[in-house]
Amino acid sequence: VAAWGVMTSRANIQRVLHEFYVYFKSLIQTFTDRGLYPYAGPVELRAHGVDNPAEVLIANAVEPTISGPRPHPDYPERDVIIWFAINNNVDQPLASEFNTRLEEFFLSNYQSYAIVRPEWTKSYAFTADGAYGGAWTNTAILTETFPNTWRDGYPANDNWDFAVATLTALDPHRIFSNSHLDKLFPI
């Protein structure tokens, strides 16, 4: 399952969905015209507000540092996140190319009025020819593009790098790690 979140303003929800629909439909048609069917599954959409510590009912609650729906201090109007889960089988022929092109669309299309973040529990950072259906193989997206959405504009004591340093301090021997997390959270 390839998945991304688009954090935007409530006023832009319809725009986000419309632009996705138009592109997704044209992407499928591009492959179909070549007699190829790299996508065989449903699209799951979810929308909700951004993290709000006041709703937690615990004194001194804070926003999770690397949460997808964490609000951005420079863009308070971006108060919702729409999750797009593309329920595709990675073994489907050309699924990695399809997902790569879709991710490229997300990262380029919405940049003027939204922030795109990965859904941590799903696949992201695609390359058209990588292992695992291309997921987690685009080093630039994995180590720069997505982490920067929690770096730029956030204070040094509450950003991506601070979270990585905290995780490293809590697990200095990398007991709770794997090759993917080692790439995502380098020492």
Feature locations, PLM:
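Conserved glycine-rich FAD pyrophosphate-binding loop
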Residues: 1-187
